[in-house]
Every structure is written in structure tokens, then in C-alpha cells.
Amino acid sequence: MVKNSFSSVISQEEKKENGGSVEFQVVSFTNKIRRLTSHLELHKKDYLSQRGLRKILGKRQRLLSYLSKKNKMRYKELINQLDIRESKTQ
């Protein structure tokens, strides 16, 4: 499996004190998504991993939707830092 060199946006101190925040969860899901994507490039017929990827994508999308409704500025900063696209449904 190819390791993805994605540096975390949130520092180690913030992880320890605020591990349940929406931003931390989105960063965590983004790391998992990138890792699974690189895995699926090598193993195209791994359907169980494809299903897991779709589930994680849905969870991240729901969290981003929640964050955009609650605090638009934090949402914009987070998607810019993670270099992910903005949702079309907003």
C-alpha cells in the first residue's frame, strides 16, 4: 500500500484537548479517504473497501454540511486547508 504524505492541519495539542470537534473528525475522515483511495488504485476489485470509502465519504459530507450551517467561516477555512471541493447542495 502506498503511504500518503498528508500532513495534519490540526496540531498535536489540539488533537488531545479537542478530539471530538467537527474539524478534527473531518480531518480524520479525509486522511482515511486518501488512504483508501490510494489502496483502491492498486486493488481495483476490492469491493468491501469501496463500500467503506462510500460510507466515510457520506459521514464526512454530513459533518461538512453541519459545519457549513453552524459556522460558514470555519467551514470555508477547513475546506481550503484540506483542499477539498465545496458541496454542490449548499
UniProtKB/Swiss-Prot annotation:
Record PROSITE patterns: RIBOSOMAL_S15
Record region (Disordered): 1-20
One family name in Pfam for this protein: Ribosomal_S15
SUPFAM superfamilies (UniProt xref): S15/NS1 RNA-binding domain
Places the protein is found: Plastid, Chloroplast
Biased composition (Polar residues): 1-11
A GO biological process held by the record: translation
Domain of life: Eukaryota
Any GO MF annotation of the entry: structural constituent of ribosome
Primary site of residence: plastid
KW Repeat (keyword) present: no
Matching Gene3D superfamilies: S15/NS1, RNA-binding
Keywords tagged on the record: Chloroplast, Plastid, Ribonucleoprotein, Ribosomal protein
GO cellular component, one term: chloroplast
Disulfide bridge map: none
HAMAP family: Ribosomal_uS15_B (MF_01343_B)
Protein family membership: Belongs to the universal ribosomal protein uS15 family.
Subunit-level organization: Part of the 30S ribosomal subunit.
Record-given protein name: Small ribosomal subunit protein uS15c
Source organism of this protein record: Cucumis sativus
